Amino acid sequence: AYVHASMFSVMALFALGDGGYAWEELEKSMVISHQMTTKSPFVFSNSYCENQDEGIFGFSAIDWFTGSGTVFIKNILRAGFGIEPDLLGLNLKTCAVMPCKKAHISLTVKGKRICVEYKNSGVGKRRIQIDGRDLRTSYDSIRRTECAHISTADLHDNMRIQILD
């Protein structure tokens, strides 16, 4: 199997609310960290061609490196942390199952520097806070998680977003 293709199945697992399995498959896709792996970071190019001067007809000579790492990171950001910018602002759909007790990431969204922090303190009911204030959430029955939306107008530099379980 190829990492690049596997990332699309991982994305689907997250979207369908099977976060535990998605994290397992994501971990398997880190081919550099395993002695024995079932995935390749390469993909067949499918660029079958004809070149009479070189005697090439109907085959692809070699694998080529893909954007596997990019799609891997995209899965962590969009599906794991659930950071999904859209035209109206920022959606937060953090995976219901996180593989760690704490995680954080700082990034720029719509020109504003934000920090998203996840913490599992065993409370059981997910809360999402902005700068220490609870944000109204809604339950996504497909992803099986609490979600929130922050409008573009409400985004500001050094915003601290906390997802608390």
Locate each region found by the language model:
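Generic helix N-cap/helix-start motif at coil->alpha-helix transitions
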Residues: A1-V3
